[in-house]
């Protein structure tokens, strides 16, 4: 598959897709993430981060670049791009945003708006070291539903994917499945 073909297919999909929005809920905080997609060796890949262990929220988890929508962010997209720049050095001008996925409510009361974007690869990523401990570059096919296993957390069951030494689960596990 060529990058031009990938973009064309994704633009077509997103032109027909209406993402589900979650209304503002008391006690919830809005956040945004970037689901960065790229072609590597002709196969669609996704970039994930390993969050630092000393963070207040979701320490040590595997996630997409992203974070809380700050008052200075004019839009959720701006927040997702800002956070991706802060965490992995991804220049917002190098991200081609193609669409939005369904919003996700986490068990920690975040309402996450995920944005799908195509990025160049290879890319000189720069891990910030404060919020991000490492990068994971994975083929999107690793997130097939039949590869998922259930994990229980706070009385709820979530899909999860074993990735090397880590586990992708919760809100992060929902988004690659939707992006496929």
Where are these regions (language model features)?
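N-terminal leader/linker segments that precede catalytic domains of diphosphate-processing enzymes
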Residues: 1-63, 68-122, 149, 156, ...
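Acidic/polar loop patches that form or flank catalytic/metal-binding clefts of enzymes
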Residues: 125
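NUDIX/MutT-family hydrolases
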Residues: 128-164
């Amino acid at each position: 598959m060529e990058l031009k073909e990938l973009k064309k297919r994704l633009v077509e999909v997103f032109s027909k897709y209406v993402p589900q929005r979650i209304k503002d809920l008391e006690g919830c905080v809005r956040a945004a993430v970037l689901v960065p997609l790229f072609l590597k060796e002709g196969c669609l890949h996704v970039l994930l981060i390993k969050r630092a262990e000393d963070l207040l929220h979701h320490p040590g988890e595997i996630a997409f670049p992203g974070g809380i929508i700050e008052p200075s962010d004019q839009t959720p997209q701006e927040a997702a791009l800002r956070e991706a720049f802060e965490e992995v050095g991804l220049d917002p001008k190098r991200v081609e945003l193609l669409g939005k996925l369904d919003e996700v409510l986490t068990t920690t009361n975040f309402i996450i708006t995920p944005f799908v974007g195509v990025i160049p690869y290879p890319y000189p990523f720069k891990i910030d070291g404060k919020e991000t401990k490492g990068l994971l570059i994975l083929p999107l096919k690793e997130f097939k539903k039949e590869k998922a296993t259930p994990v229980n957390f706070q009385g709820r069951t979530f899909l999860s994917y074993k990735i090397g030494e880590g586990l992708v689960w919760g809100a992060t596990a929902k988004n690659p499945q939707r992006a496929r």
